[in-house]
């Protein structure tokens, strides 16, 4: 930290030193939550645990904190707890769920296998959501430890599952739990198993939790066990809660504040965003301010190839379309921040024979979209539009697949293209917000709008698709 602590940071440091209360820091975009955590850590005299959202953040934090502060992610913490409970080294199999499903399908009568594989995405999505929010099948001996019901799982899925899905998901989740007890786990098990089933939690005088708004119910269950006798400091921004679709609790911060009787402190002075940028998001976050005047908001215009520039969009299809147009025009692009590249390629490959003509492929996309929408899919229109982008550029499905593979392998370009979800935690000098008017005003979409609009350090430009 190169600047003098702000009055807000001073107030937090005073609270840390002068009381034993649990604290929740509401840190707006670019408002120094990381530097504040480092400041807090530097004042501590006893051992502490810092829990970070992902591995890269944890690795960076580990270089900055005291030697007596342990830095973990929820996954690495859970892995060590489950390994200690298990008593020997665990086997981490990232394809565990697919292996279980394949064995299950292979044991079924041959006449049923095609149908079972058609349910693969629905079943595995349900199992992963179940493990994120804490569902245990009623048929399991430890079902009483569940913190979610099947209805909770269904409510959070992208589409309404067919009636057969619950029975298959329950059977395979029971098999997955049994494998975890035998020592074979995947990444979801690292949190699910120690959160709900068993394990001895380490004890620290102080536990600091970063990105609190992104905690899932099973993360919250881990925190409850971890902080039985510990002081807790949480940091997050409820306006940046955008991961409900993968199991995060949209009320994680308010729920924790009540459960742990936490005193709330603000961090509302942005070091990243100049005044024009912070004023622009007062419609959602009226308390955010900037340490510096300046910045600018623009509407319309073409992409300017300045250094440190990003194009960000709530939806993938407009992003893919513009990235492809930019690539064709001769400008190198970086689409590593597009969420669904591998999924789009997989969906294209499933449309039918690669010899399908453009017209036939477009018909297949329409049929796929109609089928998904009949199940109330929230993402089918965006996925279908992504596929249409590639099919419309070529004569055959084979050409569309090749086009998609070429685009999604572009990761070292002059302009970065990112979805709103993938842009979280990043910052750029110049940001183009593509098709902002298409963002809904319900659910977590306003939060995504805010996240995108607070990535720039200098300029924010709103642009529209040509289509």
Question: Where are the predicted features?
Answer:
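Conserved helicase C-terminal RecA-like lobe
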Residues: 349-467
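The start of beta-strands in P-loop NTPase/AAA+ ATPase cores
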Residues: 49, 68, 205-206, 232, ...
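Flexible, surface-exposed loop/gating regions in the mature catalytic domains
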Residues: 174-176, 180-181, 186-197, 208, ...
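P-loop NTPase Walker
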Residues: 1-89, 282
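Accessory N-terminal region flanking or inserted into the helicase ATPase core
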Residues: 2-14, 22-24, 36, 111-208, ...
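Conserved P-loop NTPase-based nucleic-acid remodeling module centered on helicase motor cores
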Residues: 55-130, 327-344
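Conserved helicase motor core of SF1/SF2 NTP-dependent helicases
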Residues: 26-37, 43, 53-56, 213-300, ...
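A polyampholytic, Gly/Pro-enriched intrinsically disordered region
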Residues: 87-106, 258, 284-291, 349-373
């Amino acid at each position: 930290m190169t600047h003098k602590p702000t009055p807000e940071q001073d107030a937090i440091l005073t609270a840390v030193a002068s009381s034993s209360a649990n604290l929740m820091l509401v840190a707006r975009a670019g408002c120094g939550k990381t530097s504040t955590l480092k400041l807090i850590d530097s004042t501590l005299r006893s051992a502490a645990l810092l829990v970070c959202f992902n591995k890269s953040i944890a690795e960076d934090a580990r270089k900055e904190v005291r030697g007596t502060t342990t830095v973990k992610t929820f996954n690495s913490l859970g892995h060590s707890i489950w390994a200690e409970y298990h008593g020997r080294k665990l086997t981490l199999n990232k394809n565990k769920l697919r292996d279980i499903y394949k064995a299950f399908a292979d044991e079924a009568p041959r006449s049923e296998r095609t149908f079972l594989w058609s349910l693969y995405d629905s079943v595995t999505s349900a199992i992963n959501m179940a493990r994120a929010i804490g569902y245990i099948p009623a048929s399991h001996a430890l079902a009483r430890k569940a913190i979610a019901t099947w209805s909770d799982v269904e409510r959070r899925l992208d589409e309404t599952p067919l009636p057969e899905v619950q029975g298959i998901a329950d059977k395979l989740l029971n098999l997955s739990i049994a494998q975890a007890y035998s020592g074979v786990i995947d990444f979801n098990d690292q949190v699910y198993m120690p959160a709900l089933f068993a394990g001895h939690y380490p004890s620290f005088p102080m536990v600091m939790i970063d990105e609190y708004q992104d905690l899932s119910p099973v993360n919250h269950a881990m925190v409850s066990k971890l902080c039985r006798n510990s002081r807790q400091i949480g940091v997050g921004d409820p306006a940046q809660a955008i991961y409900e679709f993968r199991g995060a609790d949209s009320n994680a911060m308010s729920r924790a504040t009540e459960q742990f009787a936490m005193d709330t402190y603000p961090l509302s002075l942005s070091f990243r965003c100049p005044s024009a940028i912070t004023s622009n998001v007062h419609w959602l976050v009226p308390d955010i301010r900037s340490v510096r005047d300046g910045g600018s908001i623009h509407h319309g215009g073409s992409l300017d190839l300045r250094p440190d520039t990003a194009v960000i969009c709530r939806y993938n299809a407009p992003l893919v379309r513009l990235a492809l147009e930019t690539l064709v025009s001769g400008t190198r692009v970086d689409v590593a921040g597009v969420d669904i590249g591998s999924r789009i390629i997989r969906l294209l490959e499933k449309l039918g024979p690669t010899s399908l003509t453009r017209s036939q492929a477009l018909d297949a996309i329409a049929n796929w979209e109609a089928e998904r929408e009949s199940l109330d899919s929230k993402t089918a229109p965006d996925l279908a539009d992504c596929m249409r982008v590639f099919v419309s550029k070529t004569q055959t499905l084979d050409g569309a697949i090749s086009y998609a593979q070429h685009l999604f392998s572009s990761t070292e370009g002059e302009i970065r293209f990112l979805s709103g979800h993938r842009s979280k935690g990043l910052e750029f000098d110049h940001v183009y917000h593509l098709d902002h008017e298409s963002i809904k005003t319900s659910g977590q979409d306003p939060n995504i709008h805010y996240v995108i609009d607070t990535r720039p350090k200098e300029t924010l430009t709103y642009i529209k698709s040509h289509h």
